[in-house]
Swiss-Prot record:
Pfam families: Rhodanese. CDD domains: RHOD. This is Uncharacterized protein BUsg_049. Residues 50-140 form the Rhodanese domain. The lineage of its organism: Bacteria, Pseudomonadati, Pseudomonadota, Gammaproteobacteria, Enterobacterales. InterPro entries: Rhodanese-like_dom, Rhodanese-like_dom_sf. It comes from Buchnera aphidicola subsp. Schizaphis graminum (strain Sg).
């Protein structure tokens, strides 16, 4: 024990760098456990859609949505997410929701949904870029929800 304290006192900068990286590794490895949502890949999203009848909510702009979106995705831009919208969609706590977000600030989107009592909120990693890169099916149909 004295050797460890002796080493730390003689190599304070090295010890602080080591401690910083240890905390960083711990934070990054446990981050997903404390999120109220999960970051999922395309494979997991397809499983949720097919097996659990997940609802896909595309939070991108109307222009991006109209340029191509996942089949049966509902376009709800960030500013339109409210309790009234959630009720109109008839979303329940038991139905998984997959968010398509083209922003690095996905936490604010997820907080909006969890704020209204929806627990099973998922975030598609890399959004439509990932979906399109794997040549998964998309459509150009207009959004019927907001009409």
């Amino acid at each position: 024990m004295q050797d460890a304290l002796f080493f730390i006192s003689n190599n304070l900068v090295l010890s602080l760098i080591w401690l910083f990286f240890l905390i960083l590794i711990f934070f990054l490895s446990t981050k997903n456990m404390f999120l109220k949502s999960k970051i999922i890949n395309n494979f997991h999203a397809i499983n949720l859609i097919n097996q659990k009848k997940a609802i896909i909510v595309d939070t991108r702009s109307v222009e991006l949505y109209d340029s191509g979106h996942i089949i049966n995705a509902i376009n709800i831009p960030f500013n339109n997410i409210c309790r009234k919208t959630i009720k109109k969609l008839s979303l329940s706590r038991s139905v998984p929701i997959i968010l398509i977000i083209d922003s690095l600030e996905y936490n604010k989107y997820i907080k909006k949904f969890t704020k209204y009592g929806l627990d099973k909120v998922y975030f598609l990693k890399n959004g439509m870029n990932s979906w399109n890169s794997e040549n998964l099916p998309t459509t150009f149909k207009k959004n019927i929800f907001l009409k």
